[in-house]
Amino acid sequence: MRLDVRYFERRQIKEAIAFAEGGGIAIHRNFDHYHGSTIRGMRRERPFLHVIGLRENLEAWGRLHGLRPEWIQPEKRRKVAHYDVFGPYAEELIAKWSPS
């Protein structure tokens, strides 16, 4: 399975969700509100991203990139789910996928 992956800036959330609902994987730059907080014993550092997609596609992309399916945040008002990604791994994704 080849997945189309695209990076979206903060203000492009509508475009990111539409892209993900269409079957792509959207790497969306999120706000850094949680910088310094902890979750499950991990300290969250900026930058923060959401990796958004239809669950099946997101699981496939996650497996290719070392992310576990149980880390996926559930679908809520939309049909897409997402991973929360932060810190050095988020920096790697930005470096790889950001057009700038």
Task: Pin down the residues of each PLM region.
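Alpha-helix initiation/capping motif
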Residues: 6-12, 55, 68, 86
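Intein-associated homing endonuclease modules of the LAGLIDADG/DOD-type, together
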Residues: 39, 58-60
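Charged, low-complexity intrinsically disordered tails and linkers
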Residues: 1-39, 44
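Short, surface-exposed ligand-recognition loops at beta-strand->loop->(often short) alpha-helix junctions
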Residues: 50-56
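Histidine-centered active-site/metal-ligand motif
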Residues: 28-36, 48-50, 80-84
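Short glycine-enriched loop/turn motifs at secondary-structure junctions
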Residues: 42-46, 75-78
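A broadly conserved detector of short glycine/acidic/proline-rich loop/turn motifs that flank catalytic sites
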Residues: 31, 55, 89
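Short, compact, well-ordered microdomains
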Residues: 60-100
